[in-house]
């Protein structure tokens, strides 16, 4: 257990006086309202794919890592797939709109940016954390100006259920945070009671992908999720971190400059898990200078370019890998 009152963050990235003032205050308020007691580890990560893409995506996951589908349900607007790896690791929930014409907040945000318009319904949604009571979490966070989805607010009712609640999309990251107070493996307890099965051809496609992983000798080498990294604008780095730490029981582990990219990597982690794969780190990456300043010195700005082209959003999900030798080649250097 890390003592957040005395912990000194790591790294060479300097933070502002504003950040240094409010970080301990965020920690203190979490304790005062009971958030650190009522919210636990990450239970799931949620991704929406375009209509018709879920099977191909799950096949891709079956080749690349340990996640396999264990349940599939229907909501009024989506097919909902539950994927598991190890019992102690977060689940992966894949949402697929039932209609190619489906439109919601994700569609509208994606259409604002030039390179995300090609797949307007594809987006990383956010993380779901286990809690003792979703109602208690709302009661604790709403006075802090954290906005939650209520019935009728969104086209997709997955974001507002009796035992599952989500925040609105963050103004800084365009991600959500969700909370669940029942077993995440029990989709029926979430009100998703209508089961469906994939066609034999779709099941065969996913099975063949899993077999390919074994044939190539990489099964067992890719472990659970290590971290997920959101790219944000240069001027919103500290705000995004403080907002996230307001909503979840994580801590600011540290931040490092990446001089070659003119950016920084900022890491938040869960203070009590003995393995990050049980509650993966949440990383925020931002340029050190905004786009309109970079041209003075022709500085690199891949992170800023990404955000300007795709919007604030998740950039990658990184899996931990097992060290070892395969086919005479070392797997990890």
Kindly give the residue locations of the regions a language model identified.
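Flexible internal linker/loop segments at domain or repeat junctions
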Residues: 279-311
């Amino acid at each position: 257990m890390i003592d957040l009152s005395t912990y000194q963050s790591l790294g060479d990235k300097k933070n502002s006086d504003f950040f240094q003032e409010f970080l301990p205050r965020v920690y203190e308020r979490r304790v005062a309202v009971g958030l650190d007691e009522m919210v636990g580890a990450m239970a799931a990560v949620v991704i929406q794919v375009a209509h018709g893409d879920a099977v191909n995506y799950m096949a891709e996951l079956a080749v690349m890592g340990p996640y396999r589908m264990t349940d599939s349900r229907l909501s009024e607007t989506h097919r909902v797939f539950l994927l598991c790896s190890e019992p102690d690791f977060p689940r992966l929930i894949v949402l697929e709109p039932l209609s190619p014409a489906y439109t919601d907040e994700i569609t509208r945000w994606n259409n604002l940016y030039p390179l995300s318009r090609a797949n307007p319904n594809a987006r990383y949604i956010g993380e779901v954390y286990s809690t003792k009571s979703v109602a208690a979490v709302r009661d604790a966070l709403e006075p802090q100006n954290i906005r939650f989805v209520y019935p009728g607010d969104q086209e997709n009712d997955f974001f507002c259920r009796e035992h599952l609640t989500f925040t609105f999309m963050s103004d800084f990251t365009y991600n959500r945070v969700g909370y669940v107070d029942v077993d995440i493996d029990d989709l029926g307890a979430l009100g998703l009671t209508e089961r469906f099965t994939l066609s034999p051809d779709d099941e065969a496609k996913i099975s063949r992908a899993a077999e390919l992983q074994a044939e190539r000798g990489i099964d067992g080498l890719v472990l659970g999720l290590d971290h997920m990294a959101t790219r944000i604008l240069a001027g919103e780095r500290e705000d995004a971190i403080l907002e996230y730490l307001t909503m979840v029981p994580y801590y600011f582990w540290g931040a490092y400059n990446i001089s070659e990219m003119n950016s920084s990597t900022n890491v938040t982690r869960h203070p009590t898990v003995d393995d990050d794969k049980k509650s993966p780190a949440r990383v925020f990456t931002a340029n050190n200078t905004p786009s309109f300043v970079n041209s003075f010195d022709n500085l690199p700005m891949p992170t800023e370019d990404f955000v300007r082209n795709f919007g604030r959003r998740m950039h990658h999900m990184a899996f931990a890998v097992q060290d070892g030798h395969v086919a005479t080649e070392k797997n990890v250097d």
